[in-house]
Amino acid sequence: MVSFELNEEEFKILEDLTNDELIALSKFKDFPICKDIKDQYLLLFLFSKKFDLEKAHTLIKNNLLIREKLEISLPVVKNQVNPELAMKSSSFNIIGYRDNNGCSISYLHPSKAKPKDFTLKEYMTFLLWSQDQSAHDHSSVHRNGMTIIEDLHKISIFKHFDSRLQDFLKKNKLNDMQDVFIGRIQKIYILNPPWVLKPLLSLAKTFMKNKLISRIEICKNDQIFTTIDQSKVLFEYGGTLNLTYIDYFNSLPSNF
């Protein structure tokens, strides 16, 4: 079994920054909205927009608006997360594992949790925590972006599709999720696609850019190992990594 020794006070996103990145960070801190926000969290927004200050400013403004509306802090720490939702392992990432291109690896398995069992705030708190705690990962990971492995086994459009987030964003006049949430998605591998996948992708085009849609690849489990070492992928997704998200979550300090 893999063991973890992650330190809640160690933010590796601050390590090995280039001179250009440090200069951009310094300029970004001059924006009024960035006042009192620690460098490690400002960097999450900057990396998401490749250090384009205006785009990063739009991102942080929208992100903070969502947090304000739902009364969610920046950062979110583990003890603010509903552990029951976390244990469903329907959406998560594990710090320290990368694909062959140096991207972080995230997992989605929507059928493991029913949206009606949790409030929108609980879902958003967990989602934002997953993003905020990525500040503990190295700067190189944030430069490279993320790869998502999504298993759609047993998904039901009636049980597992949640329109609350989309409705909430529209209500607040936020039409592009990439201008709300941090992170740069480089690839999405879809496993066990249902017959409803094409309608879902059509729906996704209403709030996701075509560039992102083009990065989605429907494949079998073994096909993902052309770009990800099998030892870096969890066993339940076809890899050989002897670890569960529950073990990982339980190993983290309460203020991580």
From Swiss-Prot:
InterPro entries: CRAL-TRIO_dom, CRAL-TRIO_dom_sf, CRAL/TRIO_N_dom_sf. Pfam families: CRAL_TRIO. Disulfide bonds: none annotated. GO terms for molecular function: phosphatidylinositol bisphosphate binding. SUPFAM superfamilies: CRAL/TRIO domain, CRAL/TRIO N-terminal domain. Residues 82-245 form the CRAL-TRIO domain. This is CRAL-TRIO domain-containing protein DDB_G0278031.
